[in-house]
Amino acid sequence: MLHQGIILREGHVTRTIYNLIKDKRYEDVIECITNIGEAANTRAGLSTLGHCYYHAQKYEEAATCYEQLCQLAPKEAKYRFYYAQSLYQAGIFAEALRVLKQISDQEEELREHCLQLQSAILYSSEDYAGAQSLLNQRAGGTADTLNDEGCLLYQADQHESAVQRFQAALQVGGFNPLVAYNVALAHFQRKQRAQALDYTSEIVERGVRNHPELGIGAQVDTDGSARSVGNPITMAMSGITQALNLKAALEYQDGNEEGAREALLDLPPRAESELDPVTLHNMALTDVQGPVAGLRKLAFLLQLGAPSCPKETFANILLICCRHELYETAADILAEHTDLTYKYLSQYLYELLDALITAQTSVELAEKKLGTLASSLAGKLRSLAAKVQEVRATNEQHALRDALKDYEQALELYLPVVMARAWISWRDDDFVGAEREFHSSAEFCSENAVWRLNAGHVLFMQGDKYNEAAAFYEPIVRQHSDDIMSVSAAVLANLCVSYIMTFQNEEAEELMRKVEKAEELKGNLGKQYHHLCIVNLVVGTLYCAKSNYEFGLTRIAHALEGGAGGRLYADTWLHVKRCILGLLTGMAKQNIILPYTAVQEVLGFLRSCEAYGLFTPANIFTATEQVPEEPLTIGLEARKLRLLLLKLSEYENC
């Protein structure tokens, strides 16, 4: 008998089947047995099929096989256990518990396994008290028991104790990538980044060494097409997926979205339909295609429901909506999923999101809600600050560490509320009102990097506080003097403008030279940065705003490489056309006279923009805006601006 290249000779069928199982070719075994016919209904055939379905992660099919075996051999308790185990993996928890209860307590060999499986089912069902009760009945000191104790401690937010249990499990049972991942996750919750990365790195290194067939770090074939390795059981047991997702979470938490994407790209290559929920969730958060694509993925996960849908999905889909000002969508999601609101949103997060959504219809009510929340958190911070001082006087290091942790956690909650209150004023161009909010929160937040950055922006936007703004920007630049490219281009541009506006031109030029030198160095390493481009654009726009169009437009043209480089796109073109339109308006009113040579330079610049931007979209559309069927391009807009400049300059020749 020949089956897809597998020769099943008479008298050697069993040997061939077991060799395939040894090679972990479970799908081939399943096809062979089901094609034999009568063998699929025998006890041996069903047992083999159940084993192969389970290891091929087809748990419902495995459960069906073991259910039939329970009927064929009702006295074999192991079949009931395998049946329950398959149901558990398939997420059918209630039925799994029912089957386990049918196994007699007299089955000593299975007692520990049954208790372990029951506690796992209750844990997955979020019945942590029930899981703890069963855990107390199990043999103590084993690797499995220590790991499960750690899981329950982790769930109770006792992360330090959880780390100790997980590490004890590793000592007793040797290295286990899934237990090592648990240690990393507990360190992650304790904000111990270095320790978490150590464990994830070890998991990945062992995975690369032991499982080259998974193609870790090789998302794409040499021909450029995606190559899927599927979801073999070895990938699940290697901890690779969990470790790289945690690494991505660490990078994302640090604000390094590119690093998070790189970590996800190192995952074994799979088709999107094959991705596990956690990977799909993290890819949604870092989707380069924008918020709409990410929201689609999160909405799909939300429809899956528990236990497949990660519990963070609901909060993240709402936060992404608010970040991209899709407030109506956020309100609809909250209204449609009231059950998830109470289950997955803390009272704090619900109140914050509710205030942001309310701000779209009633600013006064939103400010009142945020004010109440801010007052409550400020009171808590003062109380915790006093506690820290009291504990410091006792020299109890453990108590001091706990008190500082509580204070930092409260500060993490307070900061977004401060930003939300300032944002309400900011969006109405009430920068003085936003500054008042920063003054009122300085007591707690003045040392926070995010707070200082945004305080600098608020002062900068007022137009007469450039010295004060520079005082906030300068420490950020000094802190990253060894890698100035890691500083936001907006900060560098605003600091340059602040120097220019306070007659510190030498400092501005020195900063621009540093940026140019660093950008050239990074460019030689194959990395592309647009920091200098953005700085020149902002500085050029500033001079244009001061009616010095000759110098301002020269700066802008230099920033965009004369309009002939890869830096010409909708974002940068916006600065160009605003300044050109300002120039045209001034010329039309006869307030501005541009020298002949300057006009020729601007015309040449627009001609380059016309040629190189012929097919580049000229406008940016938000997630809620409909993109026209034939959107305007930079080339078309540049041609119109060039025509207007020719008319106003009374030139007939290009």
UniProtKB/Swiss-Prot annotation:
Q: Which domain of life is it from?
A: Eukaryota
Q: Name one GO molecular function term.
A: intraciliary transport particle B binding
All disulfide bonds of the chain are: none
| Example GO biological process | protein polyglutamylation
Q: Does the keyword Repeat apply?
A: yes
Stretches forming TPR repeats: 10-43, 44-76, 143-176, 178-210, 384-417, 449-483, 533-566
Listed name of the protein:
Tetratricopeptide repeat protein 30 homolog
